[in-house]
Amino acid sequence: MVTRRALHFVFKVGNRFQTVHFFRDVLGMQVLRHEEFEEGCKAACNGPYDGKWSKTMVGFGPEDDHFVAELTYNYGIGDYKLGNDFMGLTLASSQAVSNARRLEWPLSKVAEGVFETEAPGGYKFYLQDRSPSQSDPVLKVTLAVSDLQKSLNYWSNLLGMKIYEQDEEKKWALLGYADDQCKLELQGIQGAVDHSAAFGRIAFSCPQKELPDLEDLMKRESQSILTPLVSLDTPGKATVQVVILADPDGHEICFVGDEAFRELSKMDPKGSKLLDDAMAADKSDEWFATRNKPKASG
């Protein structure tokens, strides 16, 4: 029985309005929940920032059985410098391709039936012009690695992912926890992986009782633990336990206790309105404009 699930990828966003337009109107995702926070997260969910921030979960369906995007917005930060760490998110949706064309969102054809586009901030998305063969159109997240064998040892032997496909020559591998889940694609690159300021985080869930064992395993293997096991509170919602790890290239990985996360991640029918209200109330762009100052870079 599969006990681990691929949950979401965290994107830091500088322009919340444009980003929401991309995910909602171009990709066709829906707002699943929206949360506002007055101070930084204990597990650095919003990055190394300690001010006011928001989290918006968007996806093609409920978080219980869809891989979704977490859009993290730090008030006062206008952009984040991109590294070479995140290489793209691939989804199968003819609707997204047709939405992009209708809205004149830039698309470039990279293969037969596959189009590359960019979310605000420069994050790459690959849209396959076809209907998804599974219930979730999100197929894979691609991350850059500097040493494929070292990465495979980490993700497969330590984190227990199945290797679905690999090509030594092309320095490429596809991994996952289950056939019907979003996959992780590792792509070897020349040189070091640069996370810069825009670096994201990939999240998985496991039974809560496995979290201390996972942390102990990483200690024994002398692997990086960015945030030891900690409880995270969300106002008015379930408290979850998480441990934050980093792979050999420094990609951040969150493991969260599944039972509490299923409670926390329940779809909020008011999510879209909460987001729209927050965007309408966000005067940070105007505040900086009237003072002739640019927003800070991440």
UniProtKB/Swiss-Prot annotation:
Identification of the protein by name: Glyoxalase domain-containing protein 4
Domain VOC positions: 5-130, 137-258
Pfam family, one: GLOD4_N
Gene3D superfamilies attached to this UniProt entry: 2,3-Dihydroxybiphenyl 1,2-Dioxygenase, domain 1
Provenance organism: Rattus norvegicus
Top-level taxonomic group: Eukaryota
PTM annotation (N6-succinyllysine): residues: K109, K273
Subunit-structure text: Interacts with NUDT9.
